[in-house]
Amino acid sequence: MNEYRFNAMGCEVVVRGGRADEQREVEQLFRDRDRTFSRFIPGSELNRVNEASGRPILVSGLFADTLAVALQVARETDGLVDPTLGAALEAAGYTRDFSELIADPRPAGPACGPRPVGLIGRIVRVPEGAILDLNGVVKSLAVDDALALLS
């Protein structure tokens, strides 16, 4: 079975199977999602949403759909998956791509809880002071979409 490897979204992605052109499409899909949802890429759509803190902002359909899934997963897990924990991640030192981080012996900060995020259609309002981090959900959905690309 052929294997294709690349790094995206702070991790190594391994694609087993599919044609070479499909594997490249999978890589492009992951890179596109990273450009849209990364906290570490200036100008990403996620960063524009976070910078609008407290104000409504129009987002892409992909962003709105992904946020809707993240909010649903937060409800279904009683907040174990929390798309609003970006501020807590930053307070813990997660301020750049995981591959660039060094070990940090600081103790974990206080637990945070989900903050109410407004989503109506493609209009998002993140509460002032909250920072979205959709990374886990984005990776999961990217895998689902990648599987659909492979024959």
Locations of regions flagged by a protein language model:
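A contiguous, well-ordered beta/alpha segment that forms the leading edge of an enzyme domain
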Residues: 1-135, 148-151
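Short, conserved phosphate/pyrophosphate- and ester-handling motifs at nucleotide-, phospho-/glycolipid
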Residues: 139
